[in-house]
Each structure stands twice: as structure tokens, then as C-alpha cells.
A protein has these predicted regions:
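Long, low-complexity segments enriched in small/aliphatic residues
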Residues: 157-207
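Conserved nucleotide-sugar phosphate-binding/catalytic loop shared by glycosyltransferases and other
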Residues: 32-69
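C-terminal amphipathic helix plus adjacent low-complexity
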Residues: 177, 347-405
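A donor-sugar binding/catalytic signature common to diverse glycosyltransferases
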Residues: 92-95, 281-328
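A short, glycine/small-residue-rich beta-strand->loop->alpha-helix junction that serves as a flexible
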Residues: 6-19, 241
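Donor-nucleotide binding loops and adjacent catalytic segments primarily
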Residues: 190-293
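Conserved nucleotide-sugar donor-interacting segment of glycosyltransferase catalytic cores
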Residues: 71-143, 190-192
Length: 405
């Protein structure tokens, strides 16, 4: 079967799409990755046929969330459908925020599967509003808060449904929308919060790693600093809202504590560095394999990579889902979050010292990582095959949360 995997250019969405495409290709499918032009060279070097997602140029209307999600998707959908039809695509896997893929599937009349590269953010009658990272209310005040947040979320859902219907109408799609054959939640089961209304045809498939640095030309690795002191891995956030100052605060903390530091970046680092620090472009996996602690912004990609390896984290969330992720990790005992406006070298130093010195953080991270031991890209690819086979029915996957709701 020829399957297109469609995702926008943001690393947190493009990389899981590439990982899934690699697994589908490994299972004998013909794949086509459609994403931002900046990733095409790495995808092609990785042996993945790739084309650019149409009409990605910045638009002033992007400031309006409804347009950014649905209006732009409506403009992209028809040229995307023509592009995929010409390529002989028989099914689509579409990133959850790249709605153009879903619209294109409707226009083409082909089945599609939704890829969600983070914990499920669906409305639930048993949880506060998704994305807030709040614990379920335990008393009349917090239960009232939850009810108010759910009401606000329902209002937002109604508005979103109206905007989506309007966008579809502009494409001539006035009949009932073709829902996805299934949904893949690419997170660790331990990162999910148990809910009483887990949606049907939605399965947790585990994180899906893909690193473009694996396919760069020349040296692929940042050299590790000499010595045997614990190594702190610092990841610059790739999210538009990512916090700044992570590297600077981490350098001071490591100097104070006598630790080593390594940080992988997309670009070379300007300026002098002490001998116990190494910063530059390179693959993340070798550096993570030697690390004791991760400092990151709380984006799901790095969060999952750290947990899979049992690494505790200092999280400085910059916005969006990062706050939710940071709070979930804190409740699980696997991270120490610091809000960006409260970040200081003193707080960073104290947090890193605790993460390195207290084994409970690492044990908590290992417990979370173990929940995805048998999951990952190949499992996700098998689920895509099952979702696209009408003779098979996917049963809901039970969620055994390790995070207090």
C-alpha cells in the first residue's frame, strides 16, 4: 500500500511522522513524507521519498488560531490532494495539527489515520480542561474549578467545530466528515492520565524518535567532555514558545557543581566554552546514553527521549503543552520544573544537584520509561495496518496511568 505521512515543519510533529514513515517502509509499504522543505534533504538521505507541504509561507492571518488550524488547511487541502493523487497515494496518516491531511483524504476519498505526537488532549468528563496539567479536583472548590474549565473547553470545541465545518464547506465538503479510521497517541502510557471515557479507535503507540542529525554529512556527534563527573545534557527547545536561557543557566550550575555538560544544537555554538562543556550540532542519542540528567523545555519529543532512557529532567517550560508535560512529570516524581520567569542560576544549580544526588528521580523516570518498553514505531506501523484493514477492529487500549489524576 502507498501511504502518505503528512505533517507540518515543526520538529515535534515532523520527526514523529518521519519515524512512523520509516517503520511503515520497513514493513514493506511504499511511503511518501509530506512536510516542511527544511527537512527534505535529511529525509531523502534517510531513504524516505519526501515532498514539500504546499502553501506553508507565513501569513498574517496565522495570528488567528482558527485560520492557522482550519483556514490554512482548507487552502492547502486541494493542492495537497492533487499532489497525493498524482503520487498514487492510497491512504494518509495526518499529524493532528496538520488538518490539511485530513481534508485531503476527504477530497480523495481515501482512508486516513490521525497521528498525535503527545499525550491525548481530548475533552473528558472526568478531568479538568486538557493541557492545563491540573490534578483532578478533590474538594468542592477544585471540583467547581474543573466544571468551569470543562464548560469553557466545550465552548471552544463548539467554536472549533464551526470553523472546521466552514473550512470544509469552502472545499465543497458538505456531507458528514469522514472520521479517521484510527488515532495513534505517540506517548508513553505512563504519561497518560487515566480517564473514564477513553475514546474508541485510539491507541497509545509509544514515542517515535527520529533525529535528522543521523543523516547529516560529516561528523555526526558532539564530542563528550573529558572526565568522569556526571554529565548534564541540555536540549534547546524547538517549540516556538520555548524558554530561553537554558544553556546559560546550565553552564553556571555545572560549574558550581563540578559537572560536565553537553548540548546538541541545530547550529554551531559561538563563543568560548570551558573544557568540561561541549556544544554543537550532532546526534542526541550518543550524548543521552552518557547523561545523568536532562535539562529541557518540556516539549514532548525530548521529554520522551529522556524517559525512555530513564533520565530525570529539569524542565523550564516555555508555553503550550510544555506546562502540562512539566506538571505531569513533577507529579510522577521524574522532574523538577522551574517557570521561565523564576529561572535563576541559583535555582537551576539547586535543581540539578537534587536530580543528580537523589536516586528517587531516576527511579521515577525509569518507571515511566518502562511503560513504553514494548511500544514504538514498529508497533505504531502495525496499528496503522490494522486501522486500514476494514476486516479488523481495534479494541481500546487500557490506560494504566502512573501519574496521579
Amino acid at each position: 500500500m502507498k501511504i502518505a505521512v503528512v505533517a507540518g515543519p515543526a520538529p515535534g510533529h515532523a520527526f514523529p511522522a518521519a519515524s512512523l514513515a520509516t517503520a511503515l517502509q520497513g514493513r514493506g509499504h511504499e511511503v511518501l513524507v509530506v512536510t516542511g522543505v527544511s527537512w527534505l534533504p535529511a529525509l531523502e538521505r534517510a531513504g524516505l521519498p519526501a515532498e514539500h507541504l504546499p502553501l506553508l509561507k507565513a501569513d498574517p492571518r496565522d495570528a488567528i488560531f482558527g485560520f492557522r488550524l482550519y483556514g490554512r488547511a482548507a487552502e492547502q487541502a486541494r493542492p495537497l490532494a492533487d499532489q497525493l493523487t498524482a503520487a498514487g497515494v492510497e491512504a494518509i496518516v495526518s499529524d493532528t495539527l496538520t488538518v490539511a491531511g485530513a481534508f485531503a483524504a476527504d477530497l480523495m476519498g481515501v482512508p486516513w489515520v490521525e497521528l498525535i505526537p503527545h499525550p491525548l488532549q481530548d475533552y473528558s468528563v472526568g478531568l479538568p480542561a486538557p493541557g492545563a496539567g491540573l490534578q483532578r479536583g478533590r474538594n468542592p472548590i477544585t471540583k467547581g474549578r474543573d466544571a468551569m474549565l470543562r464548560a469553557m473547553h466545550r465552548k471552544g470545541l463548539r467554536q472549533g467545530a464551526s470553523e472546521r465545518a466552514e473550512a470544509r464547506s469552502g472545499l465543497g465538503l458538505t456531507d458528514g466528515e469522514r472520521m479517521p479510521n484510527g488515532r495513534l497517541v505517540a506517548t508513553l502510557p505512563g504519561m497518560e492520565i487515566a480517564r473514564p471515557d477513553w475514546p474508541a479507535n485510539t491507541v497509545i503507540v509509544g514515542p517515535m524518535e527520529w533525529d535528522p542529525a543521523e543523516w547529516t554529512v560529516g561528523n555526526k556527534d558532539v564530542p563528550l567532555p573529558p572526565g568522569d563527573a556526571p554529565l548534564v545534557f541540555v536540549s534547546a527547545s524547538t517549540a516556538p514558545t520555548g524558554a530561553t536561557g537554558l544553556l546559560e543557566a546550565s553552564l553556571v550550575a555545572c560549574e558550581m557543581l563540578g559537572l560536565r555538560l553537553v548540548s546538541t544544537q541545530f547550529d554551531t555554538h559561538d563563543g568560548p566554552l570551558p573544557e568540561w562543556a561541549s556544544v554543537g550540532p550532532g546526534r542526541q542519542a550518543p550524548a543521552l546514553a552518557a547523561a545523568a540528567v536532562v535539562v529541557a523545555g518540556g516539549g514532548h519529543g525530548m521529554l520522551a527521549k529522556a524517559l525512555i532512557r530513564g533520565l530525570p529532567q529539569l524542565v523550564i517550560p516555555g508555553g503550550g503543552e510544555q506546562f502540562d508535560n512539566a506538571r505531569r512529570l513533577k507529579r510522577a516524581g521524574a522532574a523538577i520544573p522551574i517557570l521561565p520567569m523564576r529561572l535563576s542560576t541559583a535555582k537551576a544549580t539547586t535543581a540539578v544537584a537534587r536530580l543528580v544526588g537523589d536516586p528517587r528521580y531516576r527511579l521515577a523516570a525509569e518507571r515511566l520509561g518502562a511503560t513504553a518498553r514494548h511500544l514504538g514505531p514498529d508497533y505504531a506501523a502495525r496499528m496503522v495496518e490494522r486501522f486500514l484493514d476494514p476486516a479488523q477492529r481495534i479494541r481500546e487500549r487500557p490506560v494504566r496511568s502512573r501519574i496521579a489524576a
